[in-house]
Amino acid sequence: MMIVTTDRIDGYNVKAVKGYVKGSTVQTKHIGRDITAGLKGLVGGEIKGYSEMMDEARKLAIHRMAQDAEAKGANAVIGFRLQTSTVMANAAEIIAYGTAVEVEKE
C-alpha cells in the first residue's frame, strides 16, 4: 500500500478513486507515564513514554486507514493527513485519513 501526502504519485496514474478512508485510535495515559511526566515537567526534557505512546498510536491509525483502503479495493492512499485531538483530560485521538485510489504504472 503506497501512502503519500501529495495528490499524485510520480510514475503512476490514478485508475480509479475509491473514496475517503480513515483509521483512528484513542490512547490514554498510563499512571507510570503520568508520574514521569510530572517529574519531567519540573526539570524539563522529553517525556519519552508519551513520545513512544503517540508514535505507536500514529502507526496504528495509519494501519487501520490502510486496511480501510484495501477493503475498498485500493492500492494507494493520496492526500494523506494525520490529526491529533484531545478527547478528554487524559486521552488523545489520532486520526489518519486520505483518499483511497487504484493506481497503475505509467
From Swiss-Prot:
Pfam families: YbjQ_1. Gene3D superfamilies: Hypothetical protein apc22750. Chain B (3.30.110.70). SUPFAM superfamilies: YbjQ-like. Belongs to the UPF0145 family. PANTHER family: UPF0145 PROTEIN SCO3412, UPF0145 PROTEIN YBJQ. This is UPF0145 protein BH0643.
